[in-house]
Amino acid sequence: AILHTEPDWQAFAQECRERLEAFTGDTERQMDVLREQHHAQLFRLLAQDLDGVLSVERLADHLSALADVLISVTLEAVWQTLSGRHRDQPQFAVIAYGKLGGKELGYASDLDVIFLYDDEDPEAPAIYAKLAQRFITWMTSHTPAGILFDIDIALRPDGASGLLVSSLAAFEKYQHQSAWLWEHQALTRARFCAGDHNIGAHFEALRIQVLRQTRDPAQLRSEILGMRQRMHEAHPNRSEFFDLKHDAGGMIDIEFIVQFLVLRHAAEYPAMTGDIGNIALLKLAGDLELIDSQLSVAVSD
């Protein structure tokens, strides 16, 4: 019966905290506890999935909620291991992008995240960089219980050449003055997922502000099409089978269409900034008559 009950993520988070606390000071055991908890919940969701009681959307919601909880409790546990911490609670947040950001996580998805802080302490940049580094280690290390998640931090400001953590002020300046269009596209599927809720609220306000900028439609279309073409050329399909993700008419094409619709119309239709997933955004675009409503339903299906 437990296998087939709806997950209670709040109770699960509390259970994780209690089990982690029981092994305070034993980092390796704490890391295994997180992995064991993850595996148990994955098994439950897989059982429900195989029984056909979960829609694709509902399963993705649960997998994303599971990741959110594990990110949150891991962040809390890691903070307690830092000898240089200067406050009880870090003024630090994890922002989710990509599949986690859009609550479209699959069983084997990696996590696209960036790290933001809002702290005037002169030691803050160094402390939060150490927090982020240790958080990544806890998530990605191979232990006897496996790994928790693969982490991708390529979407941080300035990419591979950028700092691991960004102050909220620097991130805001970057988005307004330096970010490429593809970085604004990425914001269509970004959300706060763990840490300081005040930073989360500031991030969401900034995200909406950026997405609602007035843009030249022709230039926007040209840039997005050019970017999509470069991606297509980087993933040639040499097989005789259709590549559901990369081929023309595949998932990435649909994602780019949704991102274009958001960046093109959010200034006039604020509802288009909602982080509600590609399917819901397509249906919303149809309801708002931005695209043919029958087409939006067909593509969503």
Regions found by a protein language model. Name each.
Residues 1-301:
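A nucleotide- and high-energy phosphate-metabolite-utilizing enzyme signature
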